[in-house]
């Protein structure tokens, strides 16, 4: 099929997928207002003729064909840096396709246990790459009582598990939580949420299926209202993406789409690999947002005439330090990359984990600085409608 255009991507989503939002069953997400922003965001990544980002979005495969760079397997530091650059200019609807890097980076380890699984991984990767499809990172199970293992829960279907093994495939049941962009991509790439023990073979499962596979149901939720005014919310209005509660109601998965079915020694391998690539994307996003915070803090301070205020300057200095620590950590992780036996390079695991921890541990303080600098205007500043109203606007 080759590269899709934005309109091709949008039409590809009208495929009979079963999805809900606010209690409403939505037969065609391309026509529903709740999905307008997330679909439009992801469609931007299909603009290969964009004068600024078109070249960054494309690369040549080993076959000489064009593909989206999200599928490029980095083999040099420069290619790894190109990936970082791409992800800083990419919607989360495309960024979650880093799940394919997680699979490909452990393909050889999987092959040592069961070569057929490794062949399935490569086949899926090439299928999605060559058809310009997007995949979601489907990893987090509803964990119930966290003192208990997966097979010890009162409800055996809290974790996704195999309920039937057949000659032509497996049948799975259960659910996954917090699945970003699940309704606006093409493939649900399911991974183990953690390592599994020998008595949990049914829960050691990994596979990929199309979103419209019978038995798959997605319940969407978003922290943002349905429509955010870009004037009042210049950043948030352009970054709305639903989180999916993905249900597998006795879903059949053919063997050629299975990457793990009971081989518990591979569960940790797959979970850790996805964790690394997911955290890398998280750190890239953290660098971008932290730099935005610095600029916002400076604007608010200048608006209030407090450029020389000692407290304001100290707060901005803390925000700058936070942003630079994250940026330098990401740079270090790429310069001190690690490499698989087959030559695929990936960010330094320790550096990425440390950066992700630092980001999360200090994020609330950065928001506190912004609140302190902005004051009550954060909540009570009149909106665009009041500004445009000739009667009230003249006072604003």
What are these regions (language model features)?
Residues 229-324:
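Glycine-rich beta->alpha junctions and the first turn(s) of the following alpha-helix
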Residues 175, 179-228:
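A short core secondary-structure module
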């Amino acid at each position: 099929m080759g590269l899709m255009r934005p309109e091709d991507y949008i039409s590809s989503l009208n495929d009979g997928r079963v999805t809900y939002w606010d209690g409403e069953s939505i037969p065609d997400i391309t026509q529903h207002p709740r999905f307008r922003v997330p679909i439009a965001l992801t469609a931007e990544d299909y603009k290969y003729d964009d004068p600024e980002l078109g070249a960054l979005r494309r690369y040549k495969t080993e076959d000489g064909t064009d593909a989206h760079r999200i599928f490029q397997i980095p083999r040099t530091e420069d290619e790894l840096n190109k990936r970082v650059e791409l992800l800083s200019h990419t919607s989360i609807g495309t960024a979650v396709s880093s799940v394919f890097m997680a699979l490909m980076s452990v393909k050889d380890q999987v092959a040592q246990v069961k070569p057929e699984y490794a062949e399935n991984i490569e086949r899926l990767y090439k299928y999605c790459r060559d058809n310009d499809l997007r995949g979601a990172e489907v990893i987090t199970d509803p964990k119930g009582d966290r003192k208990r293992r997966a097979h010890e829960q009162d409800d055996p279907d809290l974790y996704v598990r195999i309920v039937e093994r057949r000659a032509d495939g497996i049948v799975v049941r259960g659910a996954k939580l917090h699945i970003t962009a699940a309704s606006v991509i093409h493939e649900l790439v399911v991974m183990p949420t953690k390592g599994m023990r020998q008595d949990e073979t049914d829960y050691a499962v990994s596979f990929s299926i199309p979103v419209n596979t019978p038995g798959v149901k997605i319940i969407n939720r978003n922290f943002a209202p349905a429509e955010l005014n870009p004037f009042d919310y210049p950043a948030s209005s352009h970054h709305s993406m639903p989180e999916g509660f993905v249900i597998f109601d006795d879903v059949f998965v053919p063997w050629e789409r299975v990457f793990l079915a009971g081989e518990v020694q591979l569960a940790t391998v797959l979970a850790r690999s996805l964790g690394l690539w997911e955290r890398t994307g998280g750190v890239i996003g953290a660098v971008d947002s932290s730099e935005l915070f610095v600029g916002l803090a400076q604007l608010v301070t200048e608006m209030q005439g407090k450029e020389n205020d000692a407290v304001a300057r100290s707060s901005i200095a803390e925000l700058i330090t936070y942003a630079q620590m994250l940026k330098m950590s990401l740079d270090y992780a790429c310069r001190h990359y690690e490499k698989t036996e087959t030559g695929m390079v990936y960010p330094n695991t320790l550096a990425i984990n440390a950066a992700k921890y630092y980001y999360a541990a200090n994020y609330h303080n950065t928001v506190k600085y912004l609140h302190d600098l902005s004051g009550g205007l954060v909540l009570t500043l009149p909106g665009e409608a009041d500004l445009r109203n000739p009667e009230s606007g003249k006072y604003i």
